[in-house]
């Protein structure tokens, strides 16, 4: 309704408050809730998935009921420089909401975006507090991990990242109130067992498969 729309507009205004939104911008991973509005902003939408994969995810996600999938303009294919995937034109800001935690090499990802922005541009990121998500029990990502990934340069979530996310996150079935304190992890419903997590970790290594997980915790 109107109140929901207003809340989204207020959220977008806060996120974009330091961006030159009257100039050309870039939004990474808009999915079904872009921060920018293509009817108001001159923006290029990019995602690591192509349109077909995004449509599949959209159909299978119960949280997308009543929503619309934002069409993308370019695919930032894993392992390819962003500059090779988009038009060579000046961009004056970039925005990504709830994308950063999915990135296997955070520092490298940021550098790729910096490389296509004009000097002095702004990057606006929305990163969820893990204490309000299914990552509640996970340890925050460390400086050493971020720097290590910047050296290793993984182009897809690593076996360790997959293993950690699947084995240390709980299933959000709507029954858990994150504001009232949580019981021990062992008492919560899990979507994956430790054996499942290990199996997926082995699978992504063997098949070089891109399994979308929360690679980092903030």
Predicted features by range, described:
Residues 19-84:
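Class I SAM-dependent methyltransferase SAM/SAH-binding core
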Residues 9-14, 27-31, 108-110:
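Short alpha-helical segments and helix-capping/turn motifs at coil-helix boundaries
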Residues 64-78, 82-85, 108, 112-114, ...:
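S-adenosyl-L-methionine-dependent methyltransferase catalytic module, highlighting the catalytic core
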Residues 94-95:
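Hydrophobic beta-strand segment of the Class I
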Residues 1-22:
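Class I SAM-dependent methyltransferase Rossmann-like catalytic core
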């Amino acid at each position: 309704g109107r109140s929901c729309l207003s809340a989204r507009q207020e959220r977008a205004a806060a996120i974009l408050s330091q961006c030159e939104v009257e100039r050309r911008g870039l939004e990474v991973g808009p999915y079904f809730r872009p921060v920018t509005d293509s009817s108001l902003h001159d923006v290029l939408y990019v995602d690591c998935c192509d349109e077909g994969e995004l449509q599949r995810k959209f159909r299978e996600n119960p949280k997308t009921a009543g929503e619309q999938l934002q069409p993308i303009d370019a695919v930032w294919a894993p392992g390819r420089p962003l500059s090779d995937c988009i038009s060579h034109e000046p961009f004056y800001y970039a925005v990504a909401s709830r994308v950063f935690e999915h990135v296997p090499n955070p520092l490298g990802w940021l550098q790729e975006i910096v490389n296509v922005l004009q000097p002095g541009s702004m990057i606006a990121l929305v990163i969820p507090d893990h204490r309000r998500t299914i990552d509640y029990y996970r340890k925050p990502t460390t400086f050493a991990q971020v720097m290590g990934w910047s050296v290793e340069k993984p182009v897809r979530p690593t076996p360790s990242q997959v293993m950690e996310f699947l084995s240390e996150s709980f299933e959000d079935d709507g029954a858990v109130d994150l504001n009232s304190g949580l019981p021990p992890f062992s008492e919560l419903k899990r979507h994956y067992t430790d054996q499942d997590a290990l199996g997926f970790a082995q699978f992504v290594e063997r098949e070089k498969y891109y399994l979308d997980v929360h690679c980092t915790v903030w």
